Amino acid sequence: MFFEFALIGTTASGKTELANKLAYEFNASILSLDSLCVYKQINIASAKTEQKTLDELDYFGINLLNVNEHFNIALFFEEYKKAKTFAQKNNQILIITGGTSFYLKALMDGLSENFKESQSTLSNDEIYHLMIKIDPQAKIEKNDTYRLKKWLGIYEQTNKIPSEVLKETKQEALIKKLDIFEISWQKDLLEKRIIKRTKNMLNEGLIEEAKMLFDNYDHHLKALNSIGLKECKDFLDKKINLNKLEELIIIHTRQLAKRQRTFNKKFNKENLDFQSAYENLKAYILKKYQG
């Protein structure tokens, strides 16, 4: 029986671990909502599911591209279609899970025409103030470099107000209705998980992975400026020591978790405490099977 649901949460919330456990039990397919896991060479920094599990489960949205290739919403839409077709053909559940909830929102809201990012050297601050002046409806945060450059790209290419252009060019949503569950943690407990995960990543070889990436690819690539890798670049360049490296990754991961929590408020969803989430989701799935 095919049906789909989404399992979202902040970084280090345990959503992937939970999705994997459910997929094993119910023979479900999984679509990853993660903008880093799409890259074959980024494993530790993306906290990617181990290869054995990827081989055993029907996984989509992982190991699609090389680091120097560009991933965008249109490619993610194609991966979703592939995952859904596979799950329907095999009478499976499709679990959509990950931390890049922007992709999930796009699936549910529809995709606008694929405009190129601006190549302008304007700073985030400069783009943000331009946006506030001519397009206050855009509502993009000052630290969201990708969306600000995308906004500026639309403005440069059309010479029109970007939020209006996006409304005019929007395509139909791929998902009309979806049950969404968010894994919740108390802030102090999530903080401990972030600290533990950071230490584990460093012990597993994060610095070595970063060195390999920076030795072989342009450090300006968007994927290489993600949390965990950009701090390692400063460490490898001897700008910071090991203690500072760990501290910065923890701080930046905590800040990311806060942004994710804020973004996830946009969804109509059910919040689940991690400790009881597995049993609650299991009951939800069994109820769906019973009709």
Swiss-Prot record:
Its cofactor is Mg(2+). GO terms for molecular function: ATP binding; tRNA dimethylallyltransferase activity. Keywords: ATP-binding, Magnesium, Nucleotide-binding, Transferase, tRNA processing. Transmembrane segments: none annotated. Substrate binds at T11, A12, S13, G14, K15, T16. Residues 34-37 are annotated as: Interaction with substrate tRNA. The keyword Nucleotide-binding applies. ATP binds at G9, T10, T11, A12, S13, G14, K15, T16. It is an enzyme of class 2 (transferase). InterPro entries: Dimethylallyltransferase, IPT, P-loop_NTPase. Its EC number is 2.5.1.75. GO terms for biological process: tRNA modification. Catalyzes the transfer of a dimethylallyl group onto the adenine at position 37 in tRNAs that read codons beginning with uridine, leading to the formation of N6-(dimethylallyl)adenosine (i(6)A). Belongs to the IPP transferase family. This is tRNA dimethylallyltransferase. The gene is miaA.
